[in-house]
């Protein structure tokens, strides 16, 4: 296989198909892989519909999600594409972040127009911070009436605008089924769709370009050298002799300097996103720092105790609660590396939340946690995961 050597030369982008069930998300995913395989045979494998539809189960933060990953390349980019076939799977994926998306293809059947799930998916995409959506008007071969298809296009644009997405986003008329059958007109439509994806979904900001952050997993003392904190660098880069702050869990933030970076017992000049490293910290005692805090570039992250979040609560079958919960529910919220107890306030008019529901909640934590909007967490009771969510708004 001539696959490996292309990997690093192109920008890598994560995308996914979203939209109402039966509008053809999975068929379109299969059509994209086939069309790109035929166009760039040395870069791509073709994937049949049933290979994608029989999505393997994944566990993310204790929640089982059926999700398919395929990869393919255009001449400009390398794509990782996720397709969550079921509606519930899609919702769970979006909230738990099993697959982050840099952009999404909203699939709308030209024969139906936007449906309730179409709206729900676009709303969720907005809430979880998907940066860009463009549209594939699928089954366009089945609509002869030009006015009808223009009406559907207008409706979809209004839907995007209502959630602050680009109203002028490309809307490409496709037929996934006809493209899979090799009909030249519709093969070309899928090629045009991918050209639009290349052109309209912005290049993602690489993790290494973001400000440095490392969650503390462990702390120990090296005699004669000082205190070392270990963890996996979440984002950014850390160089020896750079100043950092230790944030969260405790009321005050501590400033210090990184005097050494090691990985696999070797000293490095630098640690970067994805590395598991130990950081030697100047003038810090073993008891000054603990698991659950984060080491960050000064001034980039602040600790908070009150936030609003969007959560998915596991059903009984998924190993979740057997009973609903009410206002003032007090579980633990697992952020990055540690549990912090919090009190839940339900939205006005919501009396209780049932297992299997997704809902918005307000939370007041008993200790501050370093957080930004978009940070994901698990909800646990005595170490057992009962839900997952993400921070949508910081209150205090």
UniProtKB/Swiss-Prot annotation:
Assigned protein family = Belongs to the TRAFAC class translation factor GTPase superfamily. Classic translation factor GTPase family. EF-Tu/EF-1A subfamily.
Main subcellular localisation:
cytoplasm
Q: What is the lineage of its organism?
A: Bacteria, Bacillati, Actinomycetota, Actinomycetes, Mycobacteriales
Q: Name one GO cellular component term.
A: cytosol
Which Pfam family, giving just one, matches this sequence?
Answer: GTP_EFTU_D2
Which amino acids does the record list as binding GTP?
Answer: 19-26, 83-87, 138-141
Gene that encodes it: tuf
Protein purpose: GTP hydrolase that promotes the GTP-dependent binding of aminoacyl-tRNA to the A-site of ribosomes during protein biosynthesis.
The yes or no answer to whether the keyword Nucleotide-binding is present is yes
Q: Transmembrane ranges? A: none
Q: Where does Mg(2+) bind?
A: 26
Region span, G2: 62-66
The EC designation for this entry is: 3.6.5.3
Q: Can you name the source organism?
A: Mycolicibacterium smegmatis (strain ATCC 700084 / mc(2)155) (Mycobacterium smegmatis)
For this entry, the protein name equals: Elongation factor Tu
Renumbered residue ranges of the record's region G4: 138-141
């Amino acid at each position: 296989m001539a696959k490996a050597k292309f990997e690093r030369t192109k920008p890598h982008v994560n995308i996914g198909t979203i939209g109402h069930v039966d509008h053809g998300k999975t068929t379109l995913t299969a059509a994209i892989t086939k069309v790109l395989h035929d166009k760039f045979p040395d870069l791509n494998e073709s994937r049949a519909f049933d290979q994608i539809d029989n999505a393997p189960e994944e566990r993310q933060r204790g929640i089982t999600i059926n999700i398919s990953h395929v990869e393919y390349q255009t001449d400009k980019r390398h794509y990782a594409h996720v397709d969550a076939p079921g509606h519930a799977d899609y919702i769970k994926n979006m909230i738990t972040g099993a697959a982050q998306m840099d952009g999404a293809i909203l699939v709308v059947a030209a024969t139906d127009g936007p449906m309730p799930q179409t709206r729900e998916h676009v709303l969720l995409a907005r809430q979880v911070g998907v940066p860009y959506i463009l549209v594939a008007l699928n089954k366009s071969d089945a609509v002869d009436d030009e006015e009808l298809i223009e009406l559907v296009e207008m409706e979809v644009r209004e839907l995007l605008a209502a959630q602050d997405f680009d109203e002028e986003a490309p809307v490409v008329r496709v037929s996934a089924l006809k493209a899979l059958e090799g009909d030249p007109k519709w093969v070309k439509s899928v090629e045009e769709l991918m050209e639009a994806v290349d052109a309209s979904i912005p290049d993602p900001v690489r993790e290494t370009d973001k400000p440095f952050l490392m969650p503390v997993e462990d702390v120990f003392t090296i005699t004669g050298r000082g205190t070392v904190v270990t963890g996996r660098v979440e984002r950014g880069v850390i160089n020896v002799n750079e100043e950092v702050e230790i944030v969260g869990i405790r009321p005050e933030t501590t400033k210090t300097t990184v005097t050494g970076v090691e990985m696999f017992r070797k000293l490095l000049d630098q640690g970067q996103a994805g590395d598991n490293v130990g950081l030697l910290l100047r003038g810090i005692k073993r008891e000054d720092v603990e698991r659950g805090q984060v080491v960050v570039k000064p001034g980039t992250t602040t600790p908070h105790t009150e936030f609003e979040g969007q959560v998915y609560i596991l059903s009984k079958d998924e190993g979740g609660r057997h009973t609903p919960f009410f206002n003032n529910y007090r579980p633990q919220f697992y952020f990055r590396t540690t549990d912090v107890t919090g009190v839940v306030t339900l939205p006005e008019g919501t009396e209780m939340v049932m297992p299997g529901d997704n809902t918005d909640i307000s939370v007041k934590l008993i200790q501050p946690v370093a957080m930004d909007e978009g940070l994901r967490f698990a909800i646990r009771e005595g170490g057992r995961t009962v839900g997952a969510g993400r921070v949508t708004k910081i209150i205090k």
